[in-house]
């Protein structure tokens, strides 16, 4: 993914993307963009032109120690290095402008962790049934990103990644279902602090296409 020596050296300089370090994190991870391998830059180019709708990078070079499974959520803030976050930052800034939402603690990166003792729970912190990656921000009602990046730091060789285009799925729904999606009957949370919700449709037409609002 990176030119080995220079890229790894720059990744070791990445500061925390959390709690007021956004500017330094963006600056240092932007420098990593210069060290992306030509194959990676080619993939990013195809994403920006729309030739690719999605792409899964594998064998990302990380040397940091994976932290132990936490006992609480959110877990204590991790200590350096922040190589995984640097990879996200460099790819994100190659695609455009990286940003975070106020409702996600104003962090640039929203972390999902498994929590010890909740392996079988019906929540996103379980790990034995499914560790759910929340990408709610990709359906934000006010500020919709062009790309959503998901990074799995604990890769399971036996896991299965399922990728589907929601627009293709919606086209297969019965008409009575899609008609309902056009009605303003759906409650959207637009802010958690202070709490604020609005009623909007999930579905709308744009140049005869069917974008999904949420």
Please report, for each region that a protein language model flagged, where it lies by residue.
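Active-site environment of non-heme Fe oxygenases that use a 2-His-1-carboxylate facial triad
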Residues: 1-31, 35, 51-57, 64-66, ...
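Short secondary-structure transition/capping motifs
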Residues: 28-33, 76-80, 84
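A short, acidic, amphipathic alpha-helical segment used as a generic capping/interface helix at domain edges
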Residues: 36-47
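Glycine-centered helix-coil hinge/cap
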Residues: 41, 97, 171-175
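Residues that form generic nucleotide/phosphate-binding pockets
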Residues: 46-47, 90, 94, 180, ...
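Long, hydrophobic/aromatic-enriched structural stretches that serve as scaffold segments
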Residues: 50-77, 90-101
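Short, charged/polar micro-motifs that form catalytic or ligand-binding hotspots
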Residues: 73-81, 137-140
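A gly/proline- and charged-residue-enriched helix-loop-helix capping module
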Residues: 78-125
């Amino acid at each position: 993914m990176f030119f080995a020596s220079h890229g790894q050296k720059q990744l070791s300089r990445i500061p925390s993307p959390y709690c007021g370090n956004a500017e330094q994190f963006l600056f240092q991870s932007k420098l990593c963009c210069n060290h992306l391998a030509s194959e990676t830059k080619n993939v990013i180019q195809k994403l920006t032109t729309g030739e690719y709708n999605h792409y899964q990078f594998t064998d990302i070079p990380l040397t940091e120690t994976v932290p132990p499974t936490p006992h609480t959520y959110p877990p204590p803030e991790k200590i350096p290095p922040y190589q995984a976050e640097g990879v996200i930052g460099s790819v994100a800034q190659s695609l455009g402008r990286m940003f975070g939402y106020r409702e996600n603690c104003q962090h640039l990166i929203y972390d999902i962790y498994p929590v010890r003792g909740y392996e079988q729970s019906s929540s996103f912190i379980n790990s034995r049934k499914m560790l759910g990656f929340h990408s709610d921000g990709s359906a934000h009602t006010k500020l919709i990103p062009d790309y959503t990046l998901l990074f799995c730091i604990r890769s399971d060789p036996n896991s299965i990644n399922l990728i589907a285009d929601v627009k293709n799925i919606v086209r297969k729904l019965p008409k009575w279902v899609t008609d309902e999606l056009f009605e303003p009957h759906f409650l959207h949370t637009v802010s958690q602090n202070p709490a604020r919700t609005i009623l909007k449709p999930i579905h709308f037409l744009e140049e005869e296409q069917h974008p999904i609002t949420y």
